[in-house]
Amino acid sequence: MRTWACLLLLGCGYLANALAEEAEIPREVIERLAHSQIHSIRDLQRLLEIDSVGAEEPLETSLRAHGGHGAKHALEKRPVPIRRKRSIEEAIPAVCKTRTVIYEIPRSQVDPTSANFLIWPPCVEVKRCTGCCNTSSVKCQPSRVHHRNVKVAKVEYFRKKAKLKEVQVRLEEHLECTCTSASPSPDHREEEAGRRRESGKKRKRKRLKPT
């Protein structure tokens, strides 16, 4: 009975020690990662002030850790493989930037009142902000956008005859991107002069007539 109690105490102590070692990542570390430029594992290592990068455990060490005569005997019988140095390619991050994506033109942009028509071309290429940021606390979002109008063909059928009409569709292009918080709505700076003029106008205050 005393032996079982000792084993239970040892197990609880080991579990507490393991939980203490696997601490939660500090908030300041997440913030530092979110607002830093990281292009490689070496940059990440330098930013977190880590002296060395851990490697995978060798086969001999793994078998030795499990112990026992059976593991040693299996290692002796196993043919020794010819070790070849393989250069493993480092993962290239998909950074937050503008990329060409396929945009399917919504039917509501062409004619929201009808459903019996075709659009050509149905898809176009636009520049949009894509990619990942260093942490999930920030998202890749546009910081500067531009709108342009393009012509598409709207094809309808009347009395078994095709009728084609050109319709203007407004497309949004992303010019610059940034990693920012996902909750607040981004303040896009429009490229169109008309919108800048409208935003620059001051509202006139109405004077109240004395009663």
From Swiss-Prot:
Signal peptide positions (record): 1-20
SS bonds (residue pairs): 96-140, 129-177, 133-179
Ranges of biased composition (kind: Basic and acidic residues): 186-197
Protein name (Swiss-Prot/TrEMBL): Platelet-derived growth factor subunit A
SUPFAM superfamilies recorded: Cystine-knot cytokines (SSF57501)
Glycosylation sites: 134
Annotated region (Disordered), positions in chain: 180-211
InterPro entries for the chain: Cystine-knot_cytokine, PD_growth_factor_CS, PDGF/VEGF_dom, PDGF_N
Record bears the keyword Transferase: no
Compartment(s) of residence: Secreted
Propeptide intervals in chain numbering: 21-86
A Gene Ontology BP annotation from the UniProt entry: positive regulation of MAPK cascade
Description of how the protein assembles with itself and partners: Homodimer; antiparallel disulfide-linked dimer. Heterodimer with PDGFB; antiparallel disulfide-linked dimer. The PDGFA homodimer interacts with PDGFRA homodimers, and with heterodimers formed by PDGFRA and PDGFRB. The heterodimer composed of PDGFA and PDGFB interacts with PDGFRA homodimers, and with heterodimers formed by PDGFRA and PDGFRB. Interacts with CSPG4.
MF annotations from Gene Ontology: collagen binding; growth factor activity; platelet-derived growth factor receptor binding; protein homodimerization activity
Source organism: Bos taurus (Bovine)
Record field: compositional bias (Basic residues): 198-211
Protein role: Growth factor that plays an essential role in the regulation of embryonic development, cell proliferation, cell migration, survival and chemotaxis. Potent mitogen for cells of mesenchymal origin. Required for normal lung alveolar septum formation during embryogenesis, normal development of the gastrointestinal tract, normal development of Leydig cells and spermatogenesis. Required for normal oligodendrocyte development and normal myelination in the spinal cord and cerebellum. Plays an important role in wound healing. Signaling is modulated by the formation of heterodimers with PDGFB.
Family: Belongs to the PDGF/VEGF growth factor family.
Keywords linked to the UniProt accession: Cleavage on pair of basic residues, Developmental protein, Disulfide bond, Glycoprotein, Growth factor, Mitogen, Secreted, Signal
This protein's GO CC annotations: cell surface; extracellular space; membrane
Annotated region (Receptor binding site), positions in chain: 158-162
